[in-house]
Regions:
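Short, surface-exposed beta-strand/loop "edge" segments at domain boundaries and coil↔beta transitions
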Residues: 29-40, 55-56, 72-77, 103-110, ...
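Short low-complexity stretches enriched in small and charged residues
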Residues: 45-57, 83-88, 114-118
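Short conserved beta-strand and strand-loop elements enriched in small hydrophobics
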Residues: 60-75, 133
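Domain-core detector
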Residues: 24, 56-57, 69-70, 90-94, ...
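Polar/acidic, low-complexity leader/linker segments enriched in S/T/G and N/D
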Residues: 1-65
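Short amphipathic beta-strand and strand-loop transition segments with alternating hydrophobic
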Residues: 7-17, 73-89, 141
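A broad, low-specificity signal marking well-ordered, structured residues that form hydrophobic/aromatic
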Residues: 22-26, 64-66, 94, 133, ...
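Residue microenvironments linked to proteolytic maturation
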Residues: 88-178
């Protein structure tokens, strides 16, 4: 077994019982793996985030915001509900951790904790938490724009979003409270 690991973090001072810091962790995306469906901005192309591009871009994730939309079906960069403090690539998974703003968004924390989503007004629970994550990028370079599946060779992460796994480009993403 060949395990590759790249990791970065920013140190947040420990504040026991802080009401607005709820630790989270999860998988943002998979590297060197084609997306399950085309992400927004890819002109209908599925994408592969190369390991090299992801490793080089890890520093750009730190301190970036985690956002959501009320229906958990898209990104909404104006609804920032948390901050990313650590990012690492373990195997093919780009793992994140950080803090949700729990006092400001208690309903989101509760939905992640319970696995219940209220999209469309009707609460429903699934056996597996239905929420995942999706990355937000800028300055992307594509190896060959004529390719059926775009290979991203350079990116700058500008944040991430919590959304329903069935709406994410990579369905094997997830988020949970620590």
């Amino acid at each position: 077994m060949n395990l590759q690991l790249a990791s970065m973090a920013i140190a947040m001072p420990a504040v026991h019982g802080h009401p607005n810091r709820e630790p989270f962790r999860g998988v943002l995306t998979l590297v060197d793996t084609p997306s399950d469906k085309p992400p927004a901005g890819s002109r209908g192309h599925r994408v592969i985030l190369t390991r090299t591009a992801a490793e080089r871009a890890l520093p750009s994730l730190l301190g970036m915001a985690l956002d959501y939309s009320p229906s958990f079906d898209r990104h909404d960069a104006r609804r920032k509900i948390g901050v990313i403090t650590q990012a690492e690539i373990v195997g093919k998974e780009l793992e994140l951790s950080g803090y949700l703003f729990a006092k400001d968004f208690p309903e989101i924390v509760k939905q992640i904790e319970s696995g219940i989503i209220h999209a469309g007004g009707t609460p429903r629970k699934r056996a597996q938490n239905p929420l995942g994550m999706s990355y937000e990028i800028a300055d992307a370079s594509v190896a060959d724009v004529r390719a059926k599946i775009w290979s991203l060779t350079h990116v700058t992460f500008t944040g991430a979003a919590i959304l329903r796994r069935d709406k994410a480009a990579y369905r094997d993403t997830w988020i949970e409270l620590e």
